[in-house]
Amino acid sequence: MIRIAIPNKGRLYEPTISIFKDAGLPISGGAESRKLFAKTTDPDIHILFARAADIPEYVQDGAADVGITGIDLITERGAKVETLLDLKFGKASLVLAVPEDSDFQKAEDLEGRKIATEFPEITHQYFKKHGVNVEVIKVSGACEMTPHVGIADAIVDISSSGTTMMINHLKPIETVFSSTVYLIANKESLRTKEKILDIKTALESVLNAKDRRYLMMNVPESSLQAVKEVLPGMSGPTVMKVESSKLPGESILAVHAVVDADLIFTIVNKLKKVGARDVLVVPIERIMP
């Protein structure tokens, strides 16, 4: 059995549920039902709901074989786990922020000052790298209030949009750490449980497909070379003969290719100009690596 620890709430919960569904491993039930455990469509893969901050240690200690959580939390805990895959969601930054009416402009301006944070290890390492001596004060929440009540001169805290800091009259002056969500594994489990790599492959296939589209078109044989020059594709387009052509005496070919989504507008217009017709653009659910 493989036990996967995933966030039980917060901004990481819904994207995690979604990517498992897209990967063909939908989770039955959810944390909203107050359950600690859930099943997937694979009887050998079970889900454990946990606080995102606790998941690195759960995986390190073997309570879970696999986990999904932010790389910031993994780094802060110093967890001895294998990082398998950047899932590319849950993007956030740990920022150094000061009161908006202060004169602090950079980390060096905070020599000898107090810094409040929920990430003391990352914060300590950041200031050490800059050669700045500060007093790091660990807090468990409401970090934004600490400069306004005299507890700290600045904070290091997670910022996704900057709205919360703006509301609390704080201004970011430096980015301390950039984070996304990662798939991690227990070292021993990874060595002994082959299905962990199957899970990685399934999730990776969703990421591979996310920003790509499948193009299908009919092309006169005389235009094939021009069409091939337009299409970047993954490993060149697939070309097949169309048995029934509406144009007597002219062979029609079906051409299929996978292209980046942000190139679709440009590529389709170029294809039409060189003779492609009946162009279809289709979403891709998964591309297996």
Curated annotation (Swiss-Prot):
Pathway this chain belongs to: Amino-acid biosynthesis; L-histidine biosynthesis; L-histidine from 5-phospho-alpha-D-ribose 1-diphosphate: step 1/9
ATP-binding is among the record's keywords: yes
GO biological process terms held by the UniProt record: L-histidine biosynthetic process
Reactions it catalyzes: 1-(5-phospho-beta-D-ribosyl)-ATP + diphosphate = 5-phospho-alpha-D-ribose 1-diphosphate + ATP
Class of this enzyme: transferase
Protein EC: 2.4.2.17
Subcellular location: Cytoplasm
Essential cofactor(s): Mg(2+)
Function in brief: Catalyzes the condensation of ATP and 5-phosphoribose 1-diphosphate to form N'-(5'-phosphoribosyl)-ATP (PR-ATP). Has a crucial role in the pathway because the rate of histidine biosynthesis seems to be controlled primarily by regulation of HisG enzymatic activity.
Protein name (record): ATP phosphoribosyltransferase
Organism of provenance: Methanosarcina barkeri (strain Fusaro / DSM 804)
Gene that encodes the chain: hisG
